[in-house]
């Protein structure tokens, strides 16, 4: 009996492809088929980034008080207002949000690189902010892929950002970047929550 079993095992080993059923490809992730779940994840990441931005903006005001509005011509303009919420469409919102956040990511990277000694004390917070921005952008890209939406390019060519003219210039730039990002994320949370009800 043992000889027969061994003989069978030897014969089977000669044709492994016919005996072993192929399994799923290695490393194939589970893909969610529910866009509402993907949108929920994007909303949570956006809210978390909004809270981080609000906290960092408050730190900036404490460390470097600066009255008045601050702006940078290179920052994107806020595309939507409260009056336009009712007419929002998911493709336009996701496309514009991704383009705007890519611009803010570039500005945060620039701030970390060229902000000078004054902003070095905020380097850990700026690094964490950049990491969360990158994570949210990956989530938005995934959501757009699941919904078969085009990956839009920026409306205008990217212009390299020059170094701030002075230490005060870098501080004003930081106020402008954080303030603009805060407004963009606040609008994004409202818009995404509204659009979720239409899926």
Curated annotation (Swiss-Prot):
Summarize the record's induction comment. Up-regulated in hepatocytes by oxidative stress caused by liver damage.
Region (Important for interaction with IL11RA and for the stimulation of cell proliferation) residue ranges read 182-190
Primary localization: secreted
The GO terms this record gives for MF are: cytokine activity; growth factor activity; interleukin-11 receptor binding
Keyword annotations of the record: Cytokine, Growth factor, Secreted, Signal
Q: SUPFAM superfamilies attached here?
A: 4-helical cytokines
Reported effect of changing residue 193 to A? Impairs IL11RA binding and mildly reduces stimulation of cell proliferation
Task: Give the positions of the site Important for interaction with IL6ST and for the stimulation of cell proliferation.
Answer: 168
Listed GO biological process terms: cell population proliferation; interleukin-11-mediated signaling pathway; negative regulation of hormone secretion; positive regulation of cell population proliferation; positive regulation of MAPK cascade; positive regulation of transcription by RNA polymerase II
> Mind naming one GO cellular-component term on file for this protein?
extracellular space
Kindly list the places in or outside the cell where this protein is found, as annotated in its UniProt entry.
Secreted
The record, for Pfam families, names: IL11 (PF07400)
Query: Which residues, if any, are the signal sequence?
Result: 1-21
Q: How does it assemble?
A: Interacts with either IL11RA1 or IL11RA2 to associate with IL6ST, giving rise to a multimeric signaling complex.
Task: Please state which protein family the record places this protein in.
Answer: Belongs to the IL-6 superfamily.
Q: What does this protein do?
A: Cytokine that stimulates the proliferation of hematopoietic stem cells and megakaryocyte progenitor cells and induces megakaryocyte maturation resulting in increased platelet production. Also promotes the proliferation of hepatocytes in response to liver damage. Binding to its receptor formed by IL6ST and either IL11RA1 or IL11RA2 activates a signaling cascade that promotes cell proliferation, also in the context of various cancers. Signaling leads to the activation of intracellular protein kinases and the phosphorylation of STAT3.
Q: What is this protein called?
A: Interleukin-11
Taxonomically, what lineage is the organism? Eukaryota, Metazoa, Chordata, Craniata, Vertebrata
């Amino acid at each position: 009996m043992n000889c027969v079993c061994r003989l069978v095992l030897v014969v089977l080993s000669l044709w492994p492809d016919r005996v072993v059923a192929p399994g799923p490809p290695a490393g194939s992730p589970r893909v969610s088929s529910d866009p509402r779940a993907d949108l929920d994840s994007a909303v949570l990441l956006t809210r978390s980034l909004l809270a981080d931005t609000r906290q960092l903006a408050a730190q900036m005001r404490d460390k470097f008080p600066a009255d008045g509005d601050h702006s940078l011509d290179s920052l994107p303009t806020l595309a939507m207002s409260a009056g336009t919420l009712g007419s929002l469409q998911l493709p336009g919102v996701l496309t514009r949000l991704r383009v705007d956040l890519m611009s803010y990511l570039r500005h945060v990277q620039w701030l970390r690189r060229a902000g000078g000694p004054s902003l070095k004390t905020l380097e850990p917070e700026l690094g964490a902010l950049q990491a969360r921005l990158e994570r949210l952008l990956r989530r938005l890209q995934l959501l757009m892929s699941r919904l078969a939406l085009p990956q839009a390019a920026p409306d205008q060519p990217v212009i390299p950002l020059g170094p701030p003219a002075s230490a005060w210039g870098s501080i004003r730039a930081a106020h402008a970047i954080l303030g603009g990002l805060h407004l963009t994320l606040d609008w994004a949370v409202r818009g995404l929550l509204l659009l979720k009800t239409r899926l």
